[in-house]
Amino acid sequence: MEEHSNKRPLLLSTSEDHQQVSVSEHELVSLVQRTWTEVKKIWKVAGPSIFSRLSLYSLAVITQSFAGHLNDTDLAAISIATTVITSITFGFLLGMASALETLCGQAYGAKQYHMLGIYLQRSWVVLLIGSILLLPLFIFATPILKLTGQPEVVAELAGTVAVWLIPMHMSFVFQFSLVRFLQGQLKTSVIGWVSGLALVIHLLLNWFFAKYYTIGVVGAAIMLDFSWWVSVLGLFLYAVCGGCRESWYGFSMEAFSGLWDFFKLSAASSVMLALESFYYRVLVIVAGSLGNTAVDIDALSICITSYGWEIMIPYGFLAATGVRVANELGAGNAKGVALGCGWQSQVAIVNLGSYYVVGVPLGVILEQFFGLGIKGLWTGMLSGTVVQTLTLAIITIRCQWDKQAKEAYSRVVKQAISDQSSCDT
C-alpha cells in the first residue's frame, strides 16, 4: 500500500509541475505581449502630446527671448504677464478641460461616438464662462501687481501687456477642448503637426519683426496671440471638416444640457492644476515684492521657463495615461485600470499643503533670513515639490486598487445612463 501510494503521486506531481511551468510560461508571454501593446498605445498618445506641449510652451519662451533684446524692464514685464497672469488662467482652464479628457475617452471606449461632439461643445460653453470670469485678472493686472509689491514701472507695463494677451487667454477655451476631444479618439498626430506649424510661424514672425522692425512688448504680445489662434484654427478645421466624421455631427442644443454636472466634474481638477501652476509663478511675484531687481526677476523667470520645458514630458505621459484609462473604463475593462480614482480633491489638498505651507514660506525664509536670494526661493520651491511627490507616493502605495476599479466602473455606468437619458429626451 505504501509503495503504491508513493509511486502514483510521483507521476502526478511530474505532470502537474509540467503543466504549471507551461501555464507560467504562457502567462509570462501574455504579459509581455500585453505590456508591449499597451506601451505602443501609450506612446501613440504621449509622443504627439509631448511634442505639442513643448511647441506651445515654446511660444512664450520665444517671445521672452526676443523681448530680451529690448531692455530689462520690458523683459520683466512680459515675463510676469506670460508666466504669472496668463499661467494662472492657463491652470484653471486646463483643469476644467480635463473633464473632457475623461468623458471623451470613456465615450470612445464605449463606442458612443456621437456623444464626443456633444461633450466638446459642452466643454466650450463651460470653459467660455470660466474664461470670462477670469478676465478681471487681465483687466486689473496693474493694480493687482502693485498690491503684491511689484515695482511700479514693471507693474504698469505688465498690466498693458496682460490686456493685449486677452485673445490668447480666450484661445485656451478652444485649444484645450479640441486637444482632449482628439486625444480621446487617438487622433493625436494632427495635434503635433498643427502645434509644430504654430511654432514655426511664431518663430518666423518674431525673427522678421526683430530684424526689420522695432516692436515693443505690445507687438510681442500680439504675435503670441496670433500663433495660439493658428493652432486653434488648425485643430478646429480638422475636427469639423471631415477629420472626425464619427464624432462630429454639427452644433447641437444638447451642449447646453448637463452643464452643472460637467462643471462639478472639472472643478476639483481645475483647483488642483491651478494650485500647481500658480505655485511656480507666485515665486516670481514674491521675488519682486521682496525688493529683488528686474535682473533677478528675469533670472527666476528663465529658470521656471526651463523647468517648464522639462515638465512637459511627464505631462504628455499623464495625458496618455488619462486617455487609456478612460478608454478602458468606457469599454468596461475595469481590470485594466490602475488610475482614474477620482482623487483630484485629495491631490488639491496635498498641493495646497506642500506648495503653500511648505514651499513658499521656506523659500521666503531662506531668501530673507539666510541671505540666499533667488537661490533660496528656488530651494523652497524644490522642497515643496519633494514633499508633494512623497505624499502622493504614499497615497498611491496604500491604495486598494480592486476597490477603486469597481468604483470607477460604477461611475462609468451611471454616466452612460445619464447621457443616454438626456439624448432620448
Where are these predicted regions, by residue range?
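Interhelical loop/hinge segments that connect adjacent transmembrane helices in multipass membrane
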Residues: 2-46, 190, 213-217, 221-227, ...
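Membrane-interface helix-loop junctions in multi-pass transport and translocation proteins
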Residues: 32-39, 188-233, 237, 295, ...
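Interfacial segments at transmembrane-helix termini and the short loops linking adjacent helices
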Residues: 33, 145-165, 259, 290-298, ...
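Residue-level signal for short hydrophobic patches within transmembrane helices
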Residues: 39-58, 62-63, 84, 88, ...
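Interfacial/gating helices of multi-pass transporter permease domains
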Residues: 42-45, 66-86, 110, 114-115, ...
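Helix-loop interface residues and adjacent transmembrane-helix termini in multi-pass membrane transporters
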Residues: 61, 69-72, 107-110, 184-185, ...
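Small-residue-rich hydrophobic transmembrane alpha-helices
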Residues: 61-64, 75-135, 139, 175-184, ...
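Alpha-helical transmembrane segments of multi-pass membrane proteins
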Residues: 88-89, 136-140, 152-178, 193-194, ...
